Amino acid sequence: MLYKLSKRTYLFLLLALLSTNTIAARVVNEEIALIISEHSGSVTNKHALQLTIKQLQALPQLEIKTQTRWTQGEKRFKGPLLRDVLALSAKKARYITAVAINGYRVDIPSQDYLNIDVILALTQADKPLTLRTKGPIWIIYPWSARPELEQGAYYSRAVWQLSTLEIYE
């Protein structure tokens, strides 16, 4: 059955929807978005560092224009360098393990983020990444600028919906 909505009801519903999105965006900015845990031998400090999107946005941002296997055409991604985020931890990493919300895990050698401008993308085309668009955090390599990176090993490290970085000494 189709209901006719009055103009007033329609405006109320529209305002409610818009305010919900604003509230959701505010919550995402203030909730813990990334956990950096430190591992040394058999000792784990699971919650060494907890960062919000707002804190990640406060770091210097780098824009990368690149094509990916998961998007069409060249896209603009922006976020802090992975090495800058890891520098917030006191530990020097031999490698890290990136963990996605769904449990996907992949090791990333320190040579990657020390020698390549790998970012933790927070936006695509100036729009915040969402769960639907592989966010709120997506590891992005500069594939278009560095064709030698266009291989399976590097693509497998492009973790989307990143939730945790585990640092191993």
Locations of regions flagged by a protein language model:
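N-terminal intrinsically disordered, low-complexity segments enriched in P/E/S/T
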Residues: A25-P80, D84-E169
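N-terminal signal peptide c-region/cleavage motif recognized by signal peptidases
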Residues: S19-T22
